[in-house]
A protein has these predicted regions:
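N-terminal cofactor/phosphate-binding cores enriched in small/glycine residues
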Residues: 75-89, 105-121, 131, 236
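Conserved small/polar residues in nucleotide/adenosyl-binding loops
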Residues: 270-275
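A short core secondary-structure module
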Residues: 213, 217-264
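Internal helix-loop-helix
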Residues: 111-182, 225-231
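A short, Trp-centered hydrophobic/proline-enriched beta-strand micro-motif
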Residues: 181-189
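Short beta-alpha junctions and helix-cap segments that line functional grooves
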Residues: 175, 190, 201, 219-221, ...
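Extended, charge-enriched "interface" segments that sit outside catalytic cores
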Residues: 2-92, 99, 104
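A structural signal for short hydrophobic beta-strand segments in well-ordered beta-sheet cores
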Residues: 203-206
């Protein structure tokens, strides 16, 4: 006997999201609204987002893009040096036993410029392409998952990538060079009562009376690299704006120095070298 099923209508991604929003409560609508406003506009949908919506579209990832010979050589040369360093210095079983990445390993990665892989060359970084960055993180992950997460979180959701995309020239000149000399960054979004839902976060940033700085108040958790970072990205609510006659929540990203008065790391979670 042949089993049959009735497929759901093949809604587009935006139509499906709007349909979900129309049936949700106020909090759900706010969360979806914030997510949609932050969504990047691409010529084609991403494979991952389509898969999430139940649409398998392999043509979005095949054939895989090829590197130019020049870019591939840059990656090959770096990976050769990196592989030698990892083989000689990184012991994932030691990371498992001690629950920390040895300082000597971190110092060695700093010398290799591993914390400035995508930082533009004009600011002291290596200026690698996204493809070479992906290749490098893949190599590190094959040795130790925790070390790969350290490097990836630092550069993708930590300060370097948001700074590269949205930072002012003054900010770039101030912060980018630090990542070539050992600064480690982290990302703080998740909160105890609301998880990773930015629409419901309670952390607030209020402009000081003299208008020179913001004052942040709140609690964050699950901040990858948070216990060893000296600079982090903190997501916080700022004063709402009136848009088309309606008040809209505002969420801003702040670059925060960890030695700022009032910042406290309460607890560090253990990790393993395996992903």
């Amino acid at each position: 006997m042949t089993n049959t099923r009735q497929d759901k209508p093949d809604l587009g991604q935006e139509e499906a999201i709007l349909a979900q929003a129309s049936t949700g409560n106020k909090e759900t609508k706010e969360a979806l609204e914030i997510a949609e406003e932050a969504r990047e506009k691409y010529t084609l949908p991403s494979f991952g987002s389509e898969l999430f919506m139940g649409n398998f579209k392999p043509d979005l990832i095949f054939p895989y893009p090829e590197q130019s010979p020049e870019d591939k050589k840059i990656g090959d040369d770096y990976i050769r040096s990196l592989t030698h360093f990892l083989t000689e210095n990184l012991d994932p079983e030691e990371v498992d036993r001690t629950r920390e990445i040895p300082k000597a390993v971190i110092d060695g990665l700093v010398k290799l410029g591993a914390f400035a892989l995508k930082v533009p060359k004009e600011y002291g970084g290596l200026g690698f392409s996204q493809t070479n960055y992906n290749r490098i993180i893949q190599v590190v992950a094959s040795y130790c998952g925790s070390t790969a997460v350290l490097l990836s979180a630092h550069q993708s959701i930590g300060v370097p990538q948001p700074l590269k995309m949205f930072g002012t020239e003054e900010q770039k000149k101030k912060f980018f060079p630090r990542f070539r000399t050992g600064s480690i960054s982290a990302f703080a979004l998740t909160e105890p009562d609301v998880g990773s839902d930015p629409a419901q976060m309670s952390t607030e940033a209020k402009l000081s009376e003299d208008g020179t700085h913001y004052i942040l108040n709140g609690t964050k958790l699950w901040c990858t690299n948070g216990t060893i970072a000296d600079i982090i990205i903190v997501m916080a609510k700022t004063a709402p704006k009136i848009v088309k006659g309606r008040e809209k929540k505002q969420i801003s990203a702040f670059i925060l120095e960890m030695n700022t008065p009032g910042v406290e790391v309460v607890r560090s979670e253990e990790h393993t070298s395996e992903l």
